[in-house]
Amino acid sequence: DGAGVLGVLGTPRFMAPEVVRGDAFPSTQTDLFSLSVLIFYMLMVAHPLEGEKEAAIKALDLPAMTKIYGKEPIFIFDPNDDSNRPVPGIHDNALAFWRIYPQFLRDIFIRAFTFGISDPNNGRVRESEWRVEMIRLRDAIFYCPNCSLENFYDSNALKASGGNPGLCWACAAALRLPPRIRIGKSVVMLNYNTELYPHHIDDRKMYDFSAPAAAVSKHPTNPNIWGLKNVSDDKWVVTTAEGSIKDVEPERSVSLALGAKIQFGEAIGEIKL
């Protein structure tokens, strides 16, 4: 029967809509949708298709699940369809967590659950894209100066606010951005415990997090001065904002000064404050 078939194919809540409807069998493409659901669930502690329509159902039986997850799947944050928004008091996790994350992550979820539903062959977010976005999210973390909880750097929100990083999502204290470094298209927040890896500074070593190449460190005699320590085996070349050039040998540091440019081999990183 239908329930038996679904039980063999997977759990409806985490299956691609075309599999729930019975139009397709599990495949690489349907697995990509399931991966997106799992990542959304992990970060939002909520299901991307469970909103007002799910809340209106009294008994979540097989026909109801087939409707929500298969025949009429609507993303709870679809920018063009508000018919399935999260319901306060029922879907509070989705409402709380969605606003915490930066726009680039929200955008990829929107793509995964709009185009990824309407165009399964071309709209799904691939695993390699998720890897890049998860690293980008990790690099965007910075800490609230009041409660020390993690917040996220969002360049879009920063531009829209005229450079104001806003308030901490947890304690509502005013946030202060730490120094950051731009390497190519990537931006990494330079917190007290930040480390840069080969992935960040060498395009030939994507996803290489085997050992750090740089680490934020405090000046040994002046705790108010922070720097980036070379913990690799290679020499760096630093150009200050004033134009002076110096070498930074392994185990030496460069101050986190506005406009300083660090040449890590072929890659160049610029310090922003």
Can you describe what each PLM-predicted range is?
Residues 228-232:
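Asparagine-centered strand-capping/turn motif at beta-strand->loop junctions
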